[in-house]
A protein has these predicted regions:
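Short acidic active-site motifs
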Residues: 35-39
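Short glycine-rich anion-binding loops that position phosphate/pyrophosphate groups of nucleotides
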Residues: 55-58, 81-83
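Short Gly/Thr/Asp-enriched flexible loops that form oxyanion-binding sites at enzyme active sites
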Residues: 42, 61-71
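Short beta->alpha junction loops
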Residues: 24-34
Length: 128
C-alpha cells in the first residue's frame, strides 16, 4: 500500500520538486499527536501552507484538526495509499473538512502533486 521508498527518499523528491517552484519546505514527522500539535502551534505565522499526511490520526486526531484550523493557512491532506479503495473506515477523514483538498493513492507523487497545488493556492492568496 505504501511503496518501498524511505521517508528520507520521499523528502528528497519533495525538496527537489519544491525548489523548482522556488518554494521552501520544512519537514516534520512524529507518531505522536501532541508533538504535531505543538509543532503547528509553535510555527504559526512561519508557514504559508501545510501539507499533512495524518496517518492513523486521519480518523481520530481531533487536537490535530483543531491546530490545523487555527493555523489559518491552506492545508492539503495527503495519503500514499488510496484510502478510498481500502477498508470502508479508512475513507472517513476528520481532517478532510478543514483541508482545501485531499490527494491519495499516488505514492510519493501525492506529495509532489500537493506541492504544485499548494504553490498555486499561496500564489492566489498573494495576488488578492
Amino acid at each position: 500500500h505504501y511503496g518501498t521508498m524511505t521517508l528520507e527518499q520521499i523528502n528528497e523528491r519533495i525538496s527537489e520538486h519544491a525548489s523548482k517552484l522556488e518554494l521552501e519546505v520544512t519537514f516534520y514527522q512524529s507518531n505522536h499527536e501532541g508533538n504535531l500539535v505543538d509543532h503547528i502551534q509553535e510555527n504559526w505565522g512561519n508557514y504559508e501552507g501545510i501539507i499533512i499526511n495524518p496517518g492513523a490520526l486521519t480518523y481520530y486526531g481531533y487536537s490535530l484538526k483543531d491546530a490545523l484550523i487555527d493555523a489559518n493557512v491552506p492545508i492539503i491532506e495527503v495519503h500514499l495509499s488510496n484510502i478510498h479503495g481500502r477498508e470502508d473506515w479508512r475513507s472517513n477523514s476528520i481532517i478532510a473538512d478543514v483541508a482545501q483538498g485531499q490527494i491519495a493513492g499516488f505514492g510519493w507523487r501525492s506529495y509532489t502533486a500537493a506541492i504544485d497545488i499548494i504553490s498555486g493556492l499561496i500564489n492566489d492568496q498573494e495576488s488578492h
